[in-house]
Each structure stands twice: as C-alpha cells, then as structure tokens.
From Swiss-Prot:
SUPFAM superfamilies found in the cross-reference section: FAD/NAD(P)-binding domain
Residues annotated to bind FAD: V53, A54, E73, R74, R81, R153, V169, D335, M348
Protein name as it appears in the record: Squalene epoxidase 4
Catalytic activity: squalene + reduced [NADPH--hemoprotein reductase] + O2 = (S)-2,3-epoxysqualene + oxidized [NADPH--hemoprotein reductase] + H2O + H(+)
Pathway it works in: Terpene metabolism; lanosterol biosynthesis; lanosterol from farnesyl diphosphate: step 2/3
KW Methyltransferase (keyword) present: no
Keyword Oxidoreductase tagged: yes
Species for this entry: Arabidopsis thaliana (Mouse-ear cress)
Note: SEQ4 or SEQ5 are unable to complement seq1 mutants.
Annotated EC: 1.14.14.17
Gene, per the UniProt record: SQE4
Entry-linked Gene3D superfamilies: FAD/NAD(P)-binding domain
Domain of life of the native organism: Eukaryota
Transmembrane stretches, start-end: 2-22, 43-63, 435-455
Tissue: Expressed mainly in seedlings and inflorescences.
Amino acid sequence: MTYAWLWTLLAFVLTWMVFHLIKMKKAATGDLEAEAEARRDGATDVIIVGAGVAGASLAYALAKDGRRVHVIERDLKEPQRFMGELMQAGGRFMLAQLGLEDCLEDIDAQEAKSLAIYKDGKHATLPFPDDKSFPHEPVGRLLRNGRLVQRLRQKAASLSNVQLEEGTVKSLIEEEGVVKGVTYKNSAGEEITAFAPLTVVCDGCYSNLRRSLVDNTEEVLSYMVGYVTKNSRLEDPHSLHLIFSKPLVCVIYQITSDEVRCVAEVPADSIPSISNGEMSTFLKKSMAPQIPETGNLREIFLKGIEEGLPEIKSTATKSMSSRLCDKRGVIVLGDAFNMRHPIIASGMMVALSDICILRNLLKPLPNLSNTKKVSDLVKSFYIIRKPMSATVNTLASIFSQVLVATTDEAREGMRQGCFNYLARGDFKTRGLMTILGGMNPHPLTLVLHLVAITLTSMGHLLSPFPSPRRFWHSLRILAWALQMLGAHLVDEGFKEMLIPTNAAAYRRNYIATTTV
Ligand SMILES: Cc1cc2nc3c(=O)[nH]c(=O)nc-3n(C[C@H](O)[C@H](O)[C@H](O)COP(=O)(O)OP(=O)(O)OC[C@H]3O[C@@H](n4cnc5c(N)ncnc54)[C@H](O)[C@@H]3O)c2cc1C
C-alpha cells in the first residue's frame, strides 16, 4: 500500500515516454514521406539562395521560362547599403533582355549620362557615347540599391511559379557528389530541408556556401566609406564625379532627386575608426580640401559631414576571380562567383550578363534533373561569359591600381597619363567609355586601349625634355603595365581571346547568348 503511489508514478512516466516515442517516429516517417513526395513530384525545379540583384533577377528569368523556383532570402526588408548604385547602360540592356527594365522605374533613379573626372585643378566631362552597334540608349541609372532590389524581388514574387521565402540557408545537401538541395532555417526558426534538381547559390560577397564548392579566395583591396547628403542636388546630377584624390579616389553622385552619395576610398591597412569620430575628422581634414570647388561638389561633401554623418558606412572592396564549380546540381553566381574592384561600377552588369547567358543555355532543357547535361552547359557558360567578365575585371583591376596616388614617379606618371587619356575627349576616349558602360565587351579592344594609355603615360613623363631619369621611369611604367596585363592574361584566360578570329567568335557567341 505504501508503494502504490510509486507504481502509479512509474506507470505514468512509462506511458508518457511510449506516447512521445510513437509521436516522434510518426513525425520522422512523415517528414521522410513528405521529402520523398516532394522529390517524386518535382515540386521545385530550382532553389535559389539569396534574393539580391542576381538571385531575384534569375528567379524571374527562370520562372518566365516555366521553371518552378523556390527563392530563400535571409532578409526580405529593403537592404540599406551603398553598393550597386550605378547601373551601367550595358546593365540596363541586360535587364531589358530579362524583361526587368521597368524595375528601374518609380524608384527615383537618376540618369547617368557621363563621367566627370578631376585632377589637380583640371576637369573633363566624358559622355557615354552612342555606339551604333549597341541596341540601347547609352545612358545608365544612378539609384538606391535597396529600392532596385525590392522591385526585382516584387517582380519575381508576382509570378505564380516563384515561391519567395524568408529564411537563412545553413548548408547544401549533397549525395554522392551531387547537390540535391539545402537545409535552411525559416522565419519561425524551424529547420527545413528543400530539394530540387538544381540549386543556384547567389548569396553575395560574404557567401558562406561558396567555400564548400570552389577553392578560390577573395582578397580585400581597400574600403569604401560612404554617406548620403540629404536634401541636396548636384549642379551636374547626371555625371558620376570621380576625383583623383590622395591617397585614393573620391566619388560623388546623385542617387535620388534630392540625395547625394559621397564616397571616399581608404587603404585597407589604415582605415580610421567610424565610432570614435576619427573618420569624420579624416573626411573633413584630409579629403574635403581635395574635393574641387567646381559646381557644388565640395559644399555637398562637407554638408553631409557637418550634418552629423547620419549613417556613415564602410564596405570592403574585394576581388575574386571566377572558378568553375565541378559539383553537379549546383551553380554559383553573382558576387559569390566573381568579384572585382567597384571603381568602374560594373558588378551588377556582369551578374546580369551571366544570368542572360545561363538562362538562354538552360532554356532548351525541359528537365533540369539531367545533372550531367546541366553540368556540361555550365562549362560552356564559363567560356561564353568571358568577353564581358574578362573585359570588366581587367579594366577594374588596372584602373584601381593606376589611380592609387604614390610618391613613385613612374606610378604618378601612369596616373597622370590615365587622366590625360580620358580627358582628351577624342575617338579613343569614346572607345574606352563604351567599354566602361558595358556597351562593348571586347577584350582585344581593351588591351589596345591599355597599351595606348601606357604609351600616353610614357610620353607624358618624357616631355618636354627626356632625361636619363625620366627615360628610366618611363621604362618602369612599361614594365608595370606589362606585369599588370600579364597577370590578367593568365587569370582571366585572356590569351586565346586575343587572337582576332577567336575574339570575333567569342563576341558573336556572347551576343547570341545574351540576346533573347
Ligand atoms: C562599395 C561597392 C560599390 C559597388 N558599386 C557598384 C555599382 O555602382 N554598380 C554595380 O554594377 N556594381 C557595384 N558593386 C557590385 C555590386 O554591388 C554587386 O556585384 C552586386 O550587388 C552583386 O549582387 P548579388 O546578388 O550577387 O549579391 P547581393 O546583392 O549582396 O545579394 C546577396 C543576397 O543573398 C542573401 N543571403 C546571403 N547569405 C544568405 C543565406 N545563407 N541564406 C539566404 N540568403 C542569403 C543576402 O541577404 C542578400 O540579399 C559595388 C560593390 C561594392 C563593394
């Protein structure tokens, strides 16, 4: 009798445990059944990780071709950041190819018609020229990146075969070397698995997933420090103002009808602290005096600082060459795949160009579960993208190195030579501007321009009277230029593209695959 309560308690605990064991087993079986069901049904054709510019555009393009797309994005709120604020004319063309050009409307974007350059009191404005072979108006757009991203997300989500969900992808699910899907945490904190024959990783410049797929590493080159000056309008709001300041460049541009973005680039190893006010002192004392008084550039630069730097932000500039991922069932795109210095503002354009190519390559395939076929197509994608990616990556890398101010006479000669070349305003400048705007992705033409800039720089250093010292420095310019170019010839697989017949074939192939 005394132990009756103990037996009752034991019986209760045992019943509770058996009940829960049965429940857990049922849930596990149910999960597996649901997964198997999803796989059998082929409920999703493509999973896209990340809905930035690349992920959202790709989702729309693939869904338009009838694919069932599941996009998983970590944060569906409007991104507040200062990258991707100039959509080059070439990027607008790619958006039009994808049926997304209207996403540039109703976001108070500003027309970008020219590049204005400033150095040591001299100034030149270089319009993006009208290239007759380019089927689009040669005008880009200056904008708030977050607004564009939201428009792209809305447009993708408006299609019934796109499921856009907030969630953070934790890992890829792999079976025998083939990626089958992802594990992610949804907004309710539940861990979920999703399966599809193809997963596209578009999780941006801080990508974690990339590391398990490709073995390339990113390099931090410098930092861009930026803030917005509110209630302001530049006297020339349609130019991107690039100041050849020291040690690195400043850039000022209109991003909405009454907001101006001010950016200063700072070396990676000496970035002043934002939190203790060092940064505002640096901007006010070191950078502001170098901003030309032309128009109202300096006034707006200072106004932003004096109004208390509401939201000063810094972003790392990175470079990472593209590497082919040899796993099946997965593709990496956007910044997770390939990055370059943002000095020529072309990352979004390259990502969109990649999407146009990939979409056109995948179009004839009714079933993406043929992973061997998809993997072969990805190999040709990697080659076809070269005219655009190699041209833009090389130009960005060389410009970013040339624009660094140093006390080295040869390097300063090249910096001045670059300014002189751009400021001439002749047919050569126009040619380089069409490359810059993404209207002529032609590596061979770029190499010719780079050779011409080198010769201009050498000529500048030798004039008016060549001396042995000047001659020596001009030879150093040549050596430096060859070294920079040489590195890219190898890295970007440029060599074969420089053979004129190959270059022409590459370009034809590129145009055919980017045009709907
Ligand atoms: C300072 C700076 C200035 C730039 N200026 C320009 C410019 O003017 N013009 C231009 O064309 N390019 C510019 N670029 C480059 C451009 O911003 C990028 O190339 C472009 O934004 C890349 O798009 P993306 O979709 O690959 O990445 P993002 O736009 O970064 O999108 C990645 C998305 O993935 C999501 N995500 C990340 N991890 C996960 C996860 N685990 N699960 C789910 N979602 C995830 C993120 O939330 C994000 O929405 C600039 C770059 C820098 C650094």
